[in-house]
């Protein structure tokens, strides 16, 4: 079964933040971002007979995103999952990007 603590979280925002950057309005051209995201899917190359994942290019955060992340970090250095999901969604980032930045 699902532990009681997990039931109270809003899982729709958790799942939604991975799917697209579009609806949050932080980006000047959402269509460009969607195209770029498709091209950045991790590609697998065969190197010396071994499959090798090609790393995604380093994320460039906008000054708006950085300012918001820094403000939040000054308030609290640790984000619980629902807070991370909410912050990621509000900034048009993935939860992974927010998690890595906080590390």
UniProtKB/Swiss-Prot annotation:
GO cellular component: nucleus
Positions of region (Disordered): 15-40
Disulfide bond residue pairs: none
GO-annotated molecular function: DNA-binding transcription factor activity, RNA polymerase II-specific; RNA polymerase II cis-regulatory region sequence-specific DNA binding
GO biological process: cell differentiation; negative regulation of transcription by RNA polymerase II
Xref: Gene3D superfamilies: Homeodomain-like
Localization: Nucleus
PROSITE patterns linked to this entry: HOMEOBOX_2 (PS50071)
DNA-binding region per UniProt: 54-103
Sorted UniProt keywords: Activator, Developmental protein, Differentiation, DNA-binding, Homeobox, Nucleus, Transcription, Transcription regulation
Biased composition (Low complexity): 15-31
Family: Belongs to the distal-less homeobox family.
Function: May act as a transcriptional activator by promoting terminal differentiation of interneurons in the developing retina. Likely to play a regulatory role in the development of the ventral forebrain. May play a role in craniofacial patterning and morphogenesis.
Protein name (Swiss-Prot/TrEMBL): Homeobox protein DLX-2
Gene behind the chain: DLX2
């Amino acid at each position: 079964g699902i532990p009681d603590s997990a039931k109270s979280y809003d899982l729709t925002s958790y799942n939604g933040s991975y799917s697209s950057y579009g609806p949050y309005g932080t980006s000047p051209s959402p269509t460009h971002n969607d195209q770029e995201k498709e091209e950045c899917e991790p590609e697998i190359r065969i190197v010396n007979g071994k499959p090798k994942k090609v790393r995604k290019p380093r994320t460039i955060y906008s000054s708006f995103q950085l300012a918001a992340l820094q403000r939040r970090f000054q308030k609290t250095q640790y984000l619980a999952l629902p807070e991370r999901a909410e912050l990621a969604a509000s900034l048009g980032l993935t939860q992974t990007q927010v998690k890595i930045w906080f590390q």
